[in-house]
Design a protein with these regions (language model features):
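Basic, nucleic-acid-interacting segments
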Residues: 1-269, 281, 287, 308-312, ...
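Composition- and surface-driven signal marking solvent-exposed, interaction-prone regions
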Residues: 185, 291, 305-306, 332-334
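Long, charged low-complexity interaction segments
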Residues: 268-293, 298-302, 306
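Residue-level detector of well-ordered alpha-helical segments, enriched
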Residues: 289, 302, 312-320
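Generic structural concept
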Residues: 294-297, 317, 321
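Small-residue-rich helix-loop
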Residues: 328-338
Length: 338
């Protein structure tokens, strides 16, 4: 499918769950999932399988979603982040493959909600963290690190506005000093890092006010409205038992060979930390400049191309971080759009 296509113009019988259609595993998403798991310092499951997640919602024409609950493709990863409070490791609980659902589009003028099934059946990789975040700053730092990793790996272009990088935030509050986590809500429709920061601030205030007023925080899925700067209830949040998971009968279990894994390990590119070290050593860049240049793959590609053409590395770096970034900000252009 393509971003921006007219609704329901990129569909097939498999997407819409027509009787008699059977799913087929996309080999490329398996490669991308393994590469991502390795880049996130996770353990790849050599023998994994798929499950059916059963629920009824208008954007899911089959009334079930092919996913991985019991034996996901990757587990126990780790991402190191740096904030004003210092360095911290964010634990990755699991990484699993699943198919995308459709999209509901609400028309306020007609007071109608319509279904767009263009995304149905498109494979995706979902990364689930442990509840290690304590501030919005940590969440954004993690997402920036994740975006950089996925771009370097060539797994995704990470355009949040186009949905190729999405983030659902699960949030709960608890009294200071308490070890027990509170009732969580899940927030969707978060299309930018700024929206994520604002949504976390709003939902934190809402839950605290709810508890202070003697009300109960409901476990539910909430939709972030960027224009109203608030979250709104979408539906109750089910537990795993409510989805009645069972093994997917139409996709056989996967057995990954060591040869397959070694081949993907060999394809792992030079990542941001290694490039930072090399730029400081070979080009004499400061630690801060090297960190800024390597933060996004698009900046690295531009820098490398300019230096390869004979431009002095330090001059290129200073121009990019100064004049170029200023112009991009003024014109609201992302580096990857250059």
């Amino acid at each position: 499918t393509a971003f921006g296509g007219d609704p329901n113009t990129h569909c097939c019988p498999v997407c819409t769950g027509m009787p008699g259609t059977l799913p087929v595993l996309n080999e490329k998403v398996l490669e991308f999932a393994v590469k991502t798991g390795l880049a996130l310092n996770g353990t790849i499951t050599r023998n994994c399988k798929f499950d059916r997640k059963n629920y009824f919602y208008p954007d899911l024409p089959k009334a079930y979603q092919v996913s991985q609950l019991y034996v996901p493709i990757g587990v126990n990863g780790r991402v190191s982040i740096t904030t004003a409070a210092g360095e911290k490791d964010i634990r990755i609980h699991e990484l699993h493959m699943e198919e995308d659902a459709g999209k509901l589009v609400h028309d306020p003028w007609l007071d109608q909600t319509r279904c767009d099934y263009n995304r149905c059946g498109v494979p995706l990789v979902e990364i689930v963290t442990e509840p290690d975040f304590r501030t919005a700053e940590e969440v954004v730092a993690y997402l920036e690190k994740l975006r950089s990793t996925l771009e370097y790996m060539g797994v995704s272009d990470c355009k949040m506005q186009e949905g190729s990088l999405r983030c659902d935030v699960n949030l709960s509050v608890r009294p200071a000093g308490s070890e027990e986590l509170g009732t969580r809500t899940e927030m969707k429709n978060l299309n930018s890092f700024k929206a994520i920061t604002r949504a976390i601030a709003y939902e934190t205030r809402r839950q605290i006010e709810c508890i202070e007023e003697g009300k109960r925080v409901i476990q539910e899925t909430r939709r972030w409205d960027d224009n109203k700067d608030a979250t709104f209830s979408m539906r109750s949040k089910e537990s795993a038992q409510d989805y009645r998971y069972f093994p997917e009968p139409d996709i056989p279990p996967l057995e990954l060979t060591e040869e397959f894994l070694q081949g993907l390990r060999a394809q792992q590119p030079e990542m941001a930390p290694e490039r930072q070290t090399r730029y400081q050593r070979d080009y004499g860049l400061s630690e801060q400049d090297a960190k800024l240049i390597t933060a996004q793959k698009a900046l690295v590609d531009f820098f490398e191309a300019a230096v390869t053409c004979g431009a002095p590395a330090k001059e290129v770096c200073h121009w990019m971080l100064g004049e170029m970034m200023r112009r991009l900000k003024e014109e609201a252009i992302e580096p990857k759009q250059m």
